[in-house]
Amino acid sequence: MRRRKAPVREVLGDPVYGNKVVTKFINKMMFDGKKSVAEKIIYKAFNKIEEKSGEKGIEVFEKALERVRPLVEVRSRRVGGATYQVPVEVRASRQQSLSIRWILEATRKRNERMMVDRLANELMDAASDKGAAFKKKEDVHKMAEANKAFAHYRW
């Protein structure tokens, strides 16, 4: 383990909206350091959302992240030879990173042809409590609910 906690680096806002969460999403989406490609995909997806739903793309994006954000998750805890799935609350920073990760995973698994369409549709689905990313959150919450009996093993 490291001696000191690593400092949390400050992220700059994205060039269009000045939003730090959008920057994190762009960075998480980027492959092989191709940031400009990731930015184009996200901004085109926001435009597509505005065309389809009439709502602002950034608002749908924020609503989707909020809806996919998990409140509890399960962590494995070994007690006397048995491994228990212990439900624990999720820190705010982890909630954000998990919601970003789940939306991107769900987006990449969709079968529309263009990444722009996939992202736009997944964000709209997540904002309206549908889609694979929202289902992932529901599954995590169900696991935590099912293992509520082991909550006293918290650490």
UniProtKB/Swiss-Prot annotation:
One of its GO terms (molecular function) is mRNA binding. Keywords: Ribonucleoprotein, Ribosomal protein, RNA-binding, rRNA-binding, tRNA-binding. GO terms for cellular component: cytosolic small ribosomal subunit; ribosome. Pfam families: Ribosomal_S7. One of its GO terms (biological process) is ribosomal small subunit assembly. PANTHER family: RIBOSOMAL PROTEIN S7 (PTHR11205). Belongs to the universal ribosomal protein uS7 family. Part of the 30S ribosomal subunit. Contacts proteins S9 and S11. HAMAP family: Ribosomal_uS7_B (MF_00480_B). This is Small ribosomal subunit protein uS7.
